[in-house]
Regions:
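Binding-site signature for planar aromatic cofactors or substrates
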Residues: 1-202
């Protein structure tokens, strides 16, 4: 993924925080001349200093067999928004699109049943703590869920993160972008404005 130096995000904690807040990702891998794509929620942890991502597919989804033991790419996308030159104090710039994204590559490994059970508890607790508790209390129902999925882990080989938040513009222009994003009012605009303000305060 091409990321100019001034847009690169190197703060490991920020990257982790981002993929925890936006856990829905694209899982991509080549099959012949095609690129196969799966959309799934993912959780992560750090093992020996490396980011390890965990997810699952339905057992009747044939993609997990094709991805098993192969190098895959995982893409997380956060807020993104059109940026108008009208928002700049100096209006010689071109229209552009700001965004936040993380790209992880690694080999997909299918997990054994016990690890799958542990993963499902963690995923349920992360996404819906109350429901996760109910699932553990209803053992038969919970075991049925385990039977119907294939869980996997991807230990990161590379992690690339891009925070394209107008860092290549003077502070006066960045303030103008933030003000107009806040006026836009949609969720992505508000999130992006908040991330820009946080970065500008550093």
């Amino acid at each position: 993924m091409y990321i100019p130096d001034y847009f690169g995000q190197k703060d490991f904690d920020e990257i982790r925080r981002f993929i925890e807040e936006d856990p829905f990702a694209f899982l991509l891998f080549p099959v012949g001349d095609e690129v196969t794509t799966t959309l799934i929620p993912l959780i992560h942890e750090v093992e020996d200093g490396k980011l390890v991502v965990y997810g699952h597919m339905a057992k009747n989804n044939p993609q997990w067999k094709k991805a098993m033991d192969r190098k895959v790419t995982i893409l997380f996308f956060g807020p993104h928004h059109y940026i108008s030159p009208r928002w700049y104090e100096i209006r010689k710039s071109v229209p552009t699109w700001n965004y936040v994204s993380v790209r992880i590559t690694g080999t997909l490994k299918v997990m054994e049943r016990k690890d799958t059970e542990d993963f499902l508890i963690r995923l349920s607790t992360f996404l819906d703590a109350e429901w996760g508790k109910e699932g553990r209390e209803k053992e038969a129902y919970y075991q049925k869920m385990v039977e119907e999925i294939v869980a996997f882990r991807v230990e990161s080989q590379t992690v690339d993160a891009g925070w394209k938040l107008s860092q290549n513009h003077p502070m006066s222009d960045r303030k103008g972008v933030v003000e107009n994003l806040e006026k836009a009012g949609d969720d992505d605009a508000r999130k992006m404005a908040g991330m820009m303000r946080k970065m500008m305060e550093k």
